[in-house]
Amino acid sequence: MKKIAKFLIVLGMMGQLSSCDYLDIVPDERAQESDTWKTEGAVRGYLYSCYGYLPANRTFGNSYWLAEELTAVTKELFTTFKYGYYRPVSLGFTSNTWSTIWNGIHQCYMFQESLKQVSNEYVTDEMKKQYLAESNFLIAYYHFLSMRSYGPTMIIRSVIDLETPISGFPERSSIDEVVAFINEKLDEAMSEGGLPTTWSGKDYGRATRLAALALKSRVYLYAASPLYNGNTEMYADFRSPLDGRQLIAQEKSQAKWEISATQTKYAIDEVEKAKFHLYHDADAGEPSDAKPGLPNKAQRRLRYTNIDNQTGNNPEIIWADTRNDDYYGIQRRCPPRQTLGGKFAGISMTNCPTLQTIEAFYTKNGLPINKDKTFDYDERYE
């Protein structure tokens, strides 16, 4: 009887615990998908997340794009290939370009779907048009990165469900189809003034109309180049496994060069109208204690080309990467080697041009150094 009484008491206490308000979470503070479009700041943060998949080309640790004719560095991740250290278990060494690109495209399309649900109370129609334009630019740019890395690649036109099997993904499209799609998205981005000509202040680094024009120029140049324009030597058998169609054009087209030239000339003209230009002596401003004058104007121009000018923005840069440089960034690898400790530790000149690059420069007479009779080729290192 006592056991039964104790059991009933315990059971009653458990019932009280289950019905109390102490353990209830009111309100539920877990983030919901709808929170991403409840405020202007949240929507802008969602847009900025679409930029988060841009490759960090300044980080030398992931610089598989470096080639020996451009620069020489030591102890970088890509050296694992030549030393034979790279193995299937070494996946941590790679920058995983493939996944990053497609995740970025997926994020952009998800953002566009969410943007449709945003109330005008938080984001005006004009801002929506601008945000949509930026995401279209990024979709185009990510497809360009995929084409640059892998040639004929997939074209993604909308959100793909995460549960989609491999068989449900689109196959590779031809280079001509990829080029057409990229330019279609860029035209959408630039339509109705969606992209501004330039940004300044905290918005510096976001997509602009000039960046879109520059990208169109680059894409058409790829399409016209011998790599993809009539390359029968390397890609005669590069066909779709499904229907056998050619993925890279086998007939040279002069029209592609004409289109490339027209697009490039237009991009240059528009950039110059916006007051962008090659860096000159005057852009560095007058000498000061912080910026002492150098005896040679060319040295002064080179010194400040990338780091300083009167307005704070380099007039050569059309689309800037404004992310902070990290420990392994290119800036840390360029200054002369430091022997001091503390904050200077690790700074060293580990990035430098190769002799092959230096010898590729022409003389003042416009000739290769081994062809110019006025240049003392035998004593070139003296």
Model feature map: region roles:
Residues 38-57, 77-150, 164-204:
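Conserved, well-structured interaction surfaces
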